[in-house]
């Protein structure tokens, strides 16, 4: 069985803007801190999911862990408070079909750490 993911790219309006990395392996992806998901140059911008330059798989499982971090960080900015220590740890997962009615759920975090 073969599992192939299509090529991924951020939307044109991000890739072709000053918000994206302009060179290197993250070229075209939104330039965010990998833990806070806050843009590195524009603190009022956050990115998650298929647009962010994160060294992880762009999956629904990743978004599920990224969204609460972004929500808390935006709430902190609105309340004029510092970010708490809740950060995105790079979680992502990918279901791999191994046979009829069978699969393996591969889970990852930054540095290959899994709870």
Q: PLM features: what roles do these ranges have?
A:
Residues 22-24, 64-68, 81, 113-115:
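Short, low-complexity, polar/charged sequence segments that are solvent-exposed and flexible
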Residues 59-69, 101-108:
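Short, electropositive alpha-helical surface patch
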Residues 74-115:
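C-terminal, flexible cofactor-proximal segment of oxidoreductases
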Residues 4-5, 43-46, 69, 86-89, ...:
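Broad hydrophobic/π-residue packing in well-ordered secondary structure
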Residues 1-65, 75-76:
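FAD-site-proximal beta/loop scaffold in flavoenzymes
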